[in-house]
Amino acid sequence: MPDYTREMQHGGRVAGVDEVGRGPLAGPVVAAAVMFDSGVPRRLVTQLDDSKKLTEAARLRAYAALHAARGVHIAVAAASVSEIARLNILRAAFLAMRRAVARLPHQPDMVLVDGNAAPDFGCPAQCVVGGDGESLSIAAASIVAKVVRDRLMARLSCRWPGYGWERNAGYGTAEHRAALCRAGTTPHHREAFGLVRQLTLGLVPAAAPGMAPGLVPAVLEDVS
């Protein structure tokens, strides 16, 4: 379970940052930054964990609790499909992270980033491999980013039905791959990804295993 040890070791304002959406075939990559004023409220500690380990219901409860708690600063940002195509997915994820941190009310003294690489935030940063299972700030960010992106993809699915985004969030499930073979791409598909091109050209079957690694706003106030 994550704890607040790293944050206390650094002292000052420490933000946790995580992103969601590097692997999908459609939609933006979304990043969140979460910073606690004076530690994590006790009622939140047991609700926070790596978003991938939580059920959807548990994620939604934790998301609501984070927004309801005092002394919790949350910022969300994204990099669009067009930015992913122009920059590549890693650089686009870094762009979303920088945007999220820049939207916090105060510049952090330290940024804890899930993973083994981090962008330049204009302040010190530390990479934490498996950080969403180690740091409560990163765990909180992983939950926020996941909920916001899932909601965005569900909204997009209403305008572009048939791809199952409300269920698969743009990932390359069999349902999504079959829809790409059948109906082709939408403006929200990552056409720069090889698998998307191969599916739309019929070069790979929809049931093939594996998954290759714009038109949404970079700031997602309306879905956060």
Curated annotation (Swiss-Prot):
Its cofactor is Mn(2+); Mg(2+). The keyword Cytoplasm applies. It is found in: Cytoplasm. It comes from the Bacteria. InterPro entries: RNase_HII, RNase_HII/HIII, RNase_HII/HIII_dom, RNaseH-like_sf, RNaseH_sf. Residues 12-213 form the RNase H type-2 domain. This is Ribonuclease HII. Keywords: Cytoplasm, Endonuclease, Hydrolase, Manganese, Metal-binding, Nuclease. A divalent metal cation binds at D18, E19, D114. It comes from Gluconacetobacter diazotrophicus (strain ATCC 49037 / DSM 5601 / CCUG 37298 / CIP 103539 / LMG 7603 / PAl5).
